[in-house]
């Protein structure tokens, strides 16, 4: 199976990617815009795309890898700053998540797991 993990450079995404690679034969594809993650968190062997989820090039990623499952962990966590950057959070968290969900529907992905500490 091909598993897409958003936020793969963050805590949740990188830990899940590492576990999948160590315990299964599934392929991990990761997306992160690196606004809060760290490159060293991304396990070796992950096909990594440094992208924002609001861009329209998700189609090419979905088509190239024939995604089976999405784990959506990407979000901009701005502890204490959220009231001051509402527009950014709206675009980066809500609209980006909506874009990902729409791509999942378009590409008939049956499993979509969303987790957030926001």
Segments and roles (model prediction):
Residues 1-118:
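N-terminal Rossmann-like NAD(P)+-binding domain of SDR-like oxidoreductases, especially those catalyzing
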